[in-house]
Amino acid sequence: MSKVEFNKETGPREVFCGLTSIVWLHRRMPDAFFLVVGSRTCAHLIQSAAGVMIFAEPRFGTAILEEKDLAGLADAHEELDRVVNDLIARRPEIKTLFLVGSCPSEVIKLDLATVAEKLNKRFLGQVRFVNYSGSGIETTFTQGEDGALKALIPLMESSNEEKLLLVGTLANNVEDRFKKIFKNLGISNIESFPPRQSTELPKIGKNTKVLLTQPYLSDTVRDLKHRGCEIISAPFPLGIEGSTEWFLAAAKAFKINELKVHEILSPLINRAKLALESHKEILKGKRLFLLPESQLEISLARFLHNECEMDLVEVGTPYLNKDLMKEEINLLPDNTKIVEGQHVEKQLDRVRESNPDLVVCGMGLANPLEAEGISTKWSIEMVFSPIHGIDQAADLAGLFSKPLRRNQILTTKTLVTH
């Protein structure tokens, strides 16, 4: 393991809540509906993040907790029953309905697990109900997916059939390319979790080999282990290096010759390196500070240092699972400073003191930092963009080179004007 400096902070945080993950999960499973039990603020957050108007009838919605619910003057369970009945009558195509807890529903101790259990009995054979928490009280926004997947695991049937299970939401076109490569390697039985249809859950067991596509699925991994699955230890498929090592780890688990992997990946790697050059010219030697928000920070730091030659000032992450991140940490340069958790005021002080060329942070911090003359990149963009895989390396680098390129153009125009 590289000699990395680990630090831990606690204090005020600045993050989105887990409800945000509904935006990509509802697109992934078009036969599912996500019903948030929360406030008007929850409703505005998801609608804004998804970029759709509510009259378009998206596959998510909010059962609004009014002041009388929060004050205990009304039976929230009865009101929720009414909302669910109306929803299913209006949308009979729904196959799985996720009841998603929020900060307000947790504050009033609304028992969504019991609600889901009762609804499953009432709508048996018609709609399946599961519940999880999207509250941001103790979690960050990507952990919403972790909660959703964990809630589905008890519904997965058992099977001892050997298979590769890709765990974590990917863009459909990226997933298709990954599966094609695995089949070329000789791995034919490949499934994904979450699936593209919520009712087509993969069967799992002792011969299921799990390969993670996202680093924020700690609870999901733990429950898959309890079901007997084998977790393949690998970096995450971001950039050329991470993706190559990811495929190599899968090949090793299935006893496939390493030379075959290099033979199949070589054309992809060569094209990706050429495409990466123009971005590398912008990023090389620039100083990078990553504030904690998505749990993608360590993988991004590895990619931006090793493949784009950026200098790492500090790598923040909201939560660090050293077992899952072991292979990523091994690829970081010596003396990398990793800070788990957040005291946002102290971290902002360190940002100002170090004056980096680029800060990766949440949307709430970006504008204030830009006003101070510090270039930023929203970390949430990494989750909404198809960035996984060798052939996406240039697109991933482009997300970071774009703000620096923009600043160069603005600086040049300012100099010309003066």
From Swiss-Prot:
It is an enzyme of class 1 (oxidoreductase). GO terms for molecular function: 4 iron, 4 sulfur cluster binding; ATP binding; metal ion binding; oxidoreductase activity, acting on iron-sulfur proteins as donors; oxidoreductase activity, acting on the CH-CH group of donors, iron-sulfur protein as acceptor. Its EC number is 1.3.7.7. Binds 1 [4Fe-4S] cluster per heterodimer. The cluster is bound at the heterodimer interface by residues from both subunits. It comes from the Bacteria. Keywords: 4Fe-4S, ATP-binding, Chlorophyll biosynthesis, Iron, Iron-sulfur, Metal-binding, Nucleotide-binding, Oxidoreductase, Photosynthesis. It catalyses: chlorophyllide a + oxidized 2[4Fe-4S]-[ferredoxin] + 2 ADP + 2 phosphate = protochlorophyllide a + reduced 2[4Fe-4S]-[ferredoxin] + 2 ATP + 2 H2O. SUPFAM superfamilies: Helical backbone' metal receptor. One of its GO terms (biological process) is photosynthesis, dark reaction. Pathway: Porphyrin-containing compound metabolism; chlorophyll biosynthesis (light-independent). It holds the Pfam family Oxidored_nitro. [4Fe-4S] cluster binds at C17, C42, C103. Protochlorophyllide reductase is composed of three subunits; ChlL, ChlN and ChlB. Forms a heterotetramer of two ChlB and two ChlN subunits. NCBIfam families: DPOR_bchN, PRK02842.1. Component of the dark-operative protochlorophyllide reductase (DPOR) that uses Mg-ATP and reduced ferredoxin to reduce ring D of protochlorophyllide (Pchlide) to form chlorophyllide a (Chlide). This reaction is light-independent. The NB-protein (ChlN-ChlB) is the catalytic component of the complex. Belongs to the BchN/ChlN family. PANTHER family: LIGHT-INDEPENDENT PROTOCHLOROPHYLLIDE REDUCTASE SUBUNIT N. This is Light-independent protochlorophyllide reductase subunit N. It comes from Prochlorococcus marinus (strain AS9601).
